[in-house]
């Protein structure tokens, strides 16, 4: 898969290529990340990318010319590519949307700055995406979040089973995790995890995931279809709650 990013701060975005599973995926030829500097597509010697807004108001607006120049160059090089604009007014980034993006052959992410981009540039945009109901100084961090989230669903980037069991992919929050030592400052690892009984461990983990979801994100149950393991775990959890209430 190819992911392209257009930004005025390429050095900031470059860091996403250097660490962890994304770095390995690039080295293994699974993922290609290409970063473009919008200033390289300006028409003046000062490489100006912003100007004052028509109608007045605070801040600056990103000029249309560099974007149009870039898209002419990019389309000639790669053809039509699914194009995303990072924007606080865009669709909320969700697990479902991340999976949808990961199935595309290539995506292009446009990083906004200042008060925003000239509205005429949006003619090239297929989808605006927001990572939350808050405003950042620019679109570089959202672009990096999108790259990280999407790359996890690309085949062979990480273990398929790990992705399948992750929070939101199962419709539940994740269960608690433990590692050695077994006892640390009087804090014990739950005995069931040391039992070697894989069925009991699976039910315990699902029970803990259900409990955590009910307490922290009950809204997730609205879209959750409970399977057999869920029902057994939920029944076990209810029994535990009833016994504790006695």
UniProtKB/Swiss-Prot annotation:
It comes from the Bacteria. It is an enzyme of class 2 (transferase). SUPFAM superfamilies: alpha/beta knot. Pfam families: tRNA_m1G_MT. It is found in: Cytoplasm. The keyword Protease does not apply. Specifically methylates guanosine-37 in various tRNAs. HAMAP family: TrmD. Belongs to the RNA methyltransferase TrmD family. Homodimer. This is tRNA (guanine-N(1)-)-methyltransferase.
């Amino acid at each position: 898969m190819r992911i392209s990013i257009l930004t005025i701060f390429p050095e900031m975005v470059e860091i996403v290529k250097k660490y962890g599973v994304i770095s390995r995926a690039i080295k293994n030829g699974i993922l290609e990340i290409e970063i473009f500097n919008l200033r390289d597509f300006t028409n003046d010697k000062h490489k100006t990318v912003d100007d004052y807004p028509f109608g007045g108001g605070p801040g600056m607006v990103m000029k249309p010319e560099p974007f149009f120049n870039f898209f002419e160059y990019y389309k000639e090089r790669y053809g039509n590519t699914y194009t995303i604009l990072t924007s606080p007014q865009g669709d909320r980034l969700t697990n479902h949307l991340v999976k949808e993006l990961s199935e595309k052959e290539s995506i292009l992410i446009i990083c906004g700055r200042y008060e925003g981009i000239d509205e005429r540039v949006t003619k090239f945009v297929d989808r605006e995406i927001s990572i939350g109901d808050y405003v950042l100084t620019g679109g570089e961090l959202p672009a990096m979040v999108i790259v990280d989230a999407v790359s996890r669903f690309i085949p062979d980037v990480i273990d398929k089973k790990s992705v399948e069991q992750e929070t939101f992919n199962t419709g539940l929050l994740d269960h608690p995790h433990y590692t050695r030592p077994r006892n640390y400052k009087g804090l014990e690892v739950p005995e069931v995890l040391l039992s070697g009984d894989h069925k009991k461990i699976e039910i315990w983990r699902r029970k803990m995931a259900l409990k955590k979801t009910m307490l922290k994100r009950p809204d997730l149950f609205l879209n959750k279809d409970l399977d057999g393991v869920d029902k057994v775990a939920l029944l076990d959890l209810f029994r535990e709650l009833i016994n504790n209430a006695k």
